[in-house]
């Protein structure tokens, strides 16, 4: 698991179980359930780097669609509606992607 150095496996499993059904993903509930919302700034930066698959310095829509799979192989992809809602929630400057500061604000929010 890519997040082994940051998150506990049991918390990740519980968070993923909470959004198994299509359309049930809620980023606030997920971040709280997996324990990310209580992590340090450095740990949040590590999480961002894992999710930023292309290392562009931003999390784009395609990376958000596969967001859950970063936590556990075989997890479902987010639906288009979930992906767009997630992007809208995190993209505070309207550039169509989520930067590290936006990601940190979303986790702590």
From Swiss-Prot:
SMART domains: EFh (SM00054). GO terms for molecular function: calcium ion binding. The modification N-acetylalanine is found at residue 2. Gene3D superfamilies: EF-hand (1.10.238.10). Ca(2+) 2 binds at residues 91, 93, 95, 97, 102. The N-terminus is blocked. Changing residue 32 to A: More than 50% reduction in IgE reactivity of 6 patients sera out of 11 patients sera tested. In muscle, parvalbumin is thought to be involved in relaxation after contraction. It binds two calcium ions. Belongs to the parvalbumin family. PANTHER family: PARVALBUMIN, PARVALBUMIN ALPHA. This is Parvalbumin beta. The lineage of its organism: Eukaryota, Metazoa, Chordata, Craniata, Vertebrata.
């Amino acid at each position: 698991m890519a997040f082994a150095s940051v998150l506990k496996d049991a918390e990740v499993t519980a968070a993923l179980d909470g959004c198994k059904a299509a359309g049930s993903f809620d980023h606030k509930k997920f971040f709280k359930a997996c324990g990310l919302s209580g992590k340090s700034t450095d740990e949040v930066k590590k999480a961002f780097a894992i999710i930023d698959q292309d290392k562009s310095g931003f999390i784009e829509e395609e990376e958000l669609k596969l967001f859950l799979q970063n936590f556990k192989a075989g997890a479902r992809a987010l639906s288009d509606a979930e992906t767009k809602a997630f992007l809208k929630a995190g993209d505070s400057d309207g550039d169509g992607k989520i930067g590290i500061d936006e990601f940190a604000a979303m986790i702590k929010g």
